[in-house]
Design a protein with these regions (language model features):
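Residues lining hydrophobic/aromatic ligand-binding pockets adjacent to catalytic sites
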Residues: 2-228
């Protein structure tokens, strides 16, 4: 994937601004994504650890569980670790590599099967989701997340795909579209109405979980919730 990003037309229609990439991002992120004709997924931003860039939140019988994709240390961090100081060169999101140490893919898939196996639509979407936890086709986190985003939109809002499937998969470098476009985390977008959740009796309603929660619980009606 090119490091220069995609340079869109000078005045793309209804550009919503910039969003950071997410791993099965929160519901509010997808609601915001669907609120404009197009968004810029910022691949040139400094990578921020411990965010939805590499983790998602799902519901379990015990409450919220975080699933984290491990990433490799940057060369700067490795040099700093060897020499006893912190790396000074910022790691850009487009350069973050997925770590294949451990069995995190299997652990994530097993967690999803346990959490949503009894949900109305998990079995219906399982074949679409499973490849992201079995295949190792993606070395870069940004590529992995973009493939996930495309699949989520294909399942939830296929009519939105043409805008996001254009050149370079909609990846833009910060500052290359419209001046003063806001940079958004994709969180905190308005109030969130409740919907039925698998463990609502035990936990009450858990807001703004991963898009996977909405997909498994509401299926084809997920788009109605996101558009509401």
């Amino acid at each position: 994937m090119g490091s220069q990003g995609y340079l869109p037309d000078p005045q793309p229609p209804n550009l919503g601004g910039y969003l950071h990439t997410t791993y099965f991002g929160p519901i509010s992120w997808y609601r915001q994504l669907l609120s404009a004709d197009s968004w810029a997924i910022d691949e040139g931003e400094p990578y921020v650890k411990q965010t939805t860039r590499n983790h998602c939140l799902i519901a379990t019988v015990s409450g919220v569980q975080k699933l984290t994709v491990p990433v490799e240390k940057s060369r700067s961090e490795e040099r700093g670790a060897r020499n006893g100081f912190s790396g000074s060169e910022p790691l850009l999101t487009r350069d973050v590599r997925i770590s294949e140490h451990g069995k995190w893919r299997t652990e994530h898939w097993n967690a999803l099967c346990t959490a949503y196996g009894e949900s109305p639509f998990f079995d219906y979407y399982a074949d679409d989701l499973r490849p992201f936890f079995e295949r190792r086709d993606w070395e870069l986190l940004i590529d992995y997340n973009m493939a996930i985003m495309q699949k989520m939109l294909e399942l939830i809002a296929p009519s939105h795909l043409p805008q996001l499937g254009e050149a370079a998969n909609g990846l833009f470098s910060c500052g290359r579209t419209i001046k003063n476009a806001p940079l958004s985390s994709g969180r905190g977008v308005g109030g969130e109405a409740s919907y039925w959740q698998v463990y609502q009796r035990q936990n009450g309603f858990l807001p703004d979980l991963s898009i996977l929660d909405l997909l498994c619980c509401m299926g084809p009606e997920a788009i109605l919730y996101l558009r509401n």
